[in-house]
Amino acid sequence: MEITRSNFKDTLPKVYKAIEEADFLAIDGEFSGISDGPSVSTLTNGFDTPEERYTKLKKHSMEFLLFQFGLCTFNYDNTEAKYLMKSFNFYIFPKPFNRNSPDKKFVCQSSSIDFLANQGFDFNKVFRNGIPYLNQEEERVLRDQYEDRRSQSNGASTMSYISPNSSKTPVSIPDEQKGFIDKVVERVEDFLKNEQKSMNVEPCTGYQRKLIYQTLNWKYPRGIHVETVESEKKERYIVISKVDEEERKRMEQQKQAKEREELDDAVGFSRIIQAISSSGKLVVGHNMLLDVMHTIHQFFCQLPDELNEFKEVTNCVFPRVLDTKLMASTNPFKEIIYNTSLAELEKRLKEAPFKPPKVDSAEGFQSYNTASEQLHEAGYDAYITGLCFISMANYLGSFLSPPKDYVSCRSKIVRPFFNKLFLMRIMDIPYLNLEGPDLQPKRDNVLHVTFPKEWKTSDLYQLFSAFGNIQVSWIDDTSAFVSLSQPEQVQIAVNTSKYAESYRIQTYAEYIEKKNDESQTKRKWAEDGWKDLERKRLKTQYNSYIPQNPVFYGNCFAPSFAVKRSMSPIQEEAASDDTEEVHTHENDPSNPGATEQGKKPKNHKRQKIDSAPPETSDGGSSVLFEVPDTW
């Protein structure tokens, strides 16, 4: 079901009902771009830490717009032994609803726009008829502004009402505006003496309208109604009407209802995300870190600077998430799934040993045909993401005793995959752990190398030719990480570079230590800067100045989101629906399928790096995630 600004209000109850009835939800987003950096390595380096990757994405990706959001709800029918699916495809655009609402700015990446255009994406549905939105802080500010305007009744850009409680003091009018205001008052005097019911004041500036409101508010505390309207030519002018007390109250009620409706319309698509969050349902995505970051950034609050704070916010907004790309990249799937891109994964899961899930579209909802491959339509991508999850979850049922053909999303055997987001192209950290500390591989076989800008990948291979197979991961034009096959070779490589003039080699540990020292120095400088500022404030007796940190989830979250939920927020999910013993094959962990994509082409065959998550499933199940001894 396609949803734009035109039908959003009418379809909102259907969306709410679908979310409420669902067992789990699948989401996907389409963006105006991916990275504003000069190359892919700006966003992805094979030896990023989770903190570095988060910082890069926050810096280089959040200025793009999430302008299409796909939501598929899946509800299991026990009687028919099949899922019923409801698909929604939202077109989103931050159109300001009045002059006080945020006028957002975003950037586009030409390659992304060209790609979507070639896929048949209809940009008119975004830019002409996209659903608006506000985050929590923007909504709060606008509500406060409405309350202020209502209490002040000065209405520079909205309606105002002259009431018995109006100001009793004269208005101070600048000399250059007195002639204009005197003419308006003279016209109003004549208007009150004749039989006309309303009169228009010619278009004027916002400041002049404010003076008109204040003057009439003082001179005529009863009997007239003043409002600002906008013509078809976008000209704003004042209309003055004669009213009695009963009519004034009716107009006041109409005004308040209109304001509430306008604000609800402005909140727009954010109401969908709030409903998803409040439901506590499992949210499934594919390679979904960017989807989660953009969703929080656009519809809830600004992203925090620190990764741990981002995890807290994410757990608050989405108590349970599952990434199908990570699921397909780990035991027991990684030995039988070789390509984890969404389209290829969906095809692979139709073949043995997997079984295609039974999924029908609910009555009145669009059905998709996977043979037509409507990829990069967010609703379709969300749909096949849900199919992939169902197939892999049901496959886990074959390890139960006795085996089960259907595995619920609430099953204990699925829980080890919760709240872990796939990290692209990081060689030895396959996922971001939203529930605790991230994996910390030793990387004692990794070197940090700096060299002249003219060097290419072949120069690095030649430099390390004596050390066998290596892996190169570019950082920028003059530095890269080089991974050796044997950790004991690291010190030899460092020693050979002591007298080199054109390049420098240091261990990964030395590189991290130096980087941390620089960060601490910058932090200390910032703290000292605040101290100097405070001393200057006291010396010059300025007003108290309190530095404010960006608001993450305190003020910008509605009360229902302010408290971190339990990881099982739904009452009926407190107990698992499967208690059978779980048997899994113990396989040696292998590379989860991440491929390094550096700044320059590399023509060597990479070695596999052991990388598998350490968590285990609940309730006596065997280990699905394994950790190499070197971690």
UniProtKB/Swiss-Prot annotation:
One of its GO terms (molecular function) is poly(A)-specific ribonuclease activity. Residues 147-173, 568-631 are annotated as: Disordered. The record marks 325 as: Interaction with poly(A). GO terms for cellular component: cytoplasm; nucleus. It catalyses: Exonucleolytic cleavage of poly(A) to 5'-AMP. Its main location: cytoplasm. Its EC number is 3.1.13.4. PROSITE patterns: R3H (PS51061). It is an enzyme of class 3 (hydrolase). Component of a complex at least composed of cpeb1, cpsf1, papd4/gld2, pabpc1/ePAB, parn and sympk. 3'-exoribonuclease that has a preference for poly(A) tails of mRNAs, thereby efficiently degrading poly(A) tails. Exonucleolytic degradation of the poly(A) tail is often the first step in the decay of eukaryotic mRNAs. Required during meiotic maturation to silence certain maternal mRNAs translationally. Does not require an adenosine residue at the 3' end, however, the addition of 25 non-adenylate residues at the 3' terminus, or a 3' terminal phosphate is inhibitory. Belongs to the CAF1 family. This is Poly(A)-specific ribonuclease PARN. It comes from Xenopus laevis (African clawed frog).
